[in-house]
Amino acid sequence: MNRIACTVHGRVQGVGFRYWTKRKAAALGLRGWVKNAPDGTVMLEAAGEAGLWMSLPGRCTAGLPSAP
């Protein structure tokens, strides 16, 4: 099992980003956590098979489908 940790910058608080990220990670079979940081970013850590978690950063970069 491998692990990834990252910090996401931009408009990520108050827009449902944590909930969306948690759902995407669960759909990939990943386990972990997502939380708001005091500086306005969102921090996340996910663990699972390498082939699964490698797609998570790209999905986070793409963002919510409803994002402008």
From Swiss-Prot:
It is an enzyme of class 3 (hydrolase). InterPro entries: Acylphosphatase, Acylphosphatase-like_dom, Acylphosphatase-like_dom_sf, Acylphosphatase_CS. Its EC number is 3.6.1.7. It holds the Pfam family Acylphosphatase. GO terms for molecular function: acylphosphatase activity. It comes from the Bacteria. Keywords: Hydrolase. SUPFAM superfamilies: Acylphosphatase/BLUF domain-like. The active site is at residues 18, 36. The keyword Hydrolase applies. It catalyses: an acyl phosphate + H2O = a carboxylate + phosphate + H(+). Residues 3-68 form the Acylphosphatase-like domain. PANTHER family: ACYLPHOSPHATASE (PTHR47268:SF4). Belongs to the acylphosphatase family. This is Acylphosphatase.
